[in-house]
């Protein structure tokens, strides 16, 4: 990408935070933002994956910083934003990408520990991150910023995951709309991507310890009946880049954008 192409995106020199940025969609978004000339901070709980991503992406444009952090820990999130402020000043873009899957457990069978963990990562963490991001964005002489929440078809449907994941993504939609409604007039946009089936993620790792047999069977029946087309993480990353800084996207706020080849038009 040439210098003029970088500048045309509007992200050159801007500071972006991508959670879960060391793998899957997060890494693809990180690469796209770096190519646009941004300062990108990634946080991930997987230290080995961070090390591998740094080695892979450090030669690209922009400025890459990586932090190993547990986004469910308030003190670690606070330390993360202190680090960003010390290195770059204020934040321009937050991508709430990090998430965990449940085991397809329905409400009658779910264990409270699993519920608490899924909600902590998928909903409470984005709340905390958005809280500190908004404060940083508002501290600019001319307040501005963009928050992108990575949701799912499970945010609008009931049978694409278990109870915990479904509830967490429905909640993320509410967080998106509330943030957009209150802070839009102050210059901060917040939107959610309603994701379909992606290739290039680590979602399969969620089921290494097994899953709820009947719950998974119900989901598989839906998938086999409708056979959704998959999306590539690089294509989704391009949408995040446009949403963060592309021409005309500055008017988009509080939107739920389906990035799923029409999947949610069938099941959502």
From Swiss-Prot:
<feature type="binding site">
    <location>
        <position position="165"/>
    </location>
    <ligand>
        <name>NADP(+)</name>
    </ligand>
</feature>
<dbReference type="GO" id="GO:0016114">
    <property type="term" value="P:terpenoid biosynthetic process"/>
</dbReference>
<protein>
    <recommendedName>
        <fullName>Short chain dehydrogenase/reductase dpchG</fullName>
        <ecNumber>1.1.1.-</ecNumber>
    </recommendedName>
</protein>
<comment type="similarity">
    <text>Belongs to the short-chain dehydrogenases/reductases (SDR) family.</text>
</comment>
<feature type="active site" description="Proton acceptor">
    <location>
        <position position="165"/>
    </location>
</feature>
<feature type="binding site">
    <location>
        <position position="169"/>
    </location>
    <ligand>
        <name>NADP(+)</name>
    </ligand>
</feature>
<feature type="active site" description="Lowers pKa of active site Tyr">
    <location>
        <position position="169"/>
    </location>
</feature>
<comment type="function">
    <text>Short chain dehydrogenase/reductase; part of the gene cluster that mediates the biosynthesis of the diterpenoid pyrones higginsianins A and B. The first step of the pathway is the synthesis of the alpha-pyrone moiety by the polyketide synthase dpchA via condensation of one acetyl-CoA starter unit with 3 malonyl-CoA units and 2 methylations. The alpha-pyrone is then combined with geranylgeranyl pyrophosphate (GGPP) formed by the GGPP synthase dpchD through the action of the prenyltransferase dpchC to yield a linear alpha-pyrone diterpenoid.</text>
</comment>
<keyword id="KW-0560">Oxidoreductase</keyword>
<feature type="binding site">
    <location>
        <position position="97"/>
    </location>
    <ligand>
        <name>NADP(+)</name>
    </ligand>
</feature>
<dbReference type="InterPro" id="IPR036291">
    <property type="entry name" value="NAD(P)-bd_dom_sf"/>
</dbReference>
<comment type="pathway">
    <text>Secondary metabolite biosynthesis; terpenoid biosynthesis.</text>
</comment>
<dbReference type="Pfam" id="PF00106">
    <property type="entry name" value="adh_short"/>
</dbReference>
<feature type="binding site">
    <location>
        <position position="18"/>
    </location>
    <ligand>
        <name>NADP(+)</name>
    </ligand>
</feature>
<dbReference type="InterPro" id="IPR020904">
    <property type="entry name" value="Sc_DH/Rdtase_CS"/>
</dbReference>
<keyword id="KW-0521">NADP</keyword>
<feature type="binding site">
    <location>
        <position position="131"/>
    </location>
    <ligand>
        <name>NADP(+)</name>
    </ligand>
</feature>
<dbReference type="InterPro" id="IPR002347">
    <property type="entry name" value="SDR_fam"/>
</dbReference>
<feature type="binding site">
    <location>
        <position position="70"/>
    </location>
    <ligand>
        <name>NADP(+)</name>
    </ligand>
</feature>
<dbReference type="GO" id="GO:0016491">
    <property type="term" value="F:oxidoreductase activity"/>
</dbReference>
């Amino acid at each position: 990408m040439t210098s003029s192409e970088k500048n045309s995106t509007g992200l050159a020199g801007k500071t972006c935070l991508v959670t879960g940025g060391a793998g899957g969609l997060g890494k693809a978004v990180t690469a796209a933002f770096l190519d646009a000339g941004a300062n990108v901070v990634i946080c991930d709980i997987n230290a080995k994956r961070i090390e591998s991503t740094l080695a892979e992406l450090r030669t690209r444009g922009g400025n890459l910083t990586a932090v190993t952090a547990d986004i469910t820990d308030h003190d670690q999130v606070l330390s993360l934003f202190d680090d960003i402020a010390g290195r770059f000043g204020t934040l321009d873009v937050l991508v709430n990408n990090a998430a965990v899957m449940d085991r397809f457990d329905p409400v009658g069978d779910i264990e409270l520990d699993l519920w608490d963990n899924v909600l902590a990562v998928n909903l409470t963490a984005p709340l905390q991150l958005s809280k500190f991001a908004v404060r940083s964005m508002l501290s600019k002489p001319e307040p501005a910023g963009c928050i992108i929440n990575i949701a799912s078809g499970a945010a609008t449907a009931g049978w694409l995951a278990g109870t915990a994941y479904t509830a967490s993504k429905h909640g993320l939609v509410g967080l998106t709309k509330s943030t957009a409604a209150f802070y839009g007039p102050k210059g901060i946009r917040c939107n959610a991507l309603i994701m379909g089936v992606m290739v290039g993620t680590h979602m399969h790792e969620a089921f290494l310890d097994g899953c709820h047999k009947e719950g998974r069977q119900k989901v598989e029946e839906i998938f086999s009946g409708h056979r959704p087309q998959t999306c590539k993480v690089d294509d989704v990353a391009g949408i995040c880049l446009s949403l963060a800084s592309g021409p005309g996207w500055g008017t988009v706020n509080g939107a739920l954008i389906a990035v799923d080849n029409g999947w949610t038009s069938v099941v959502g």
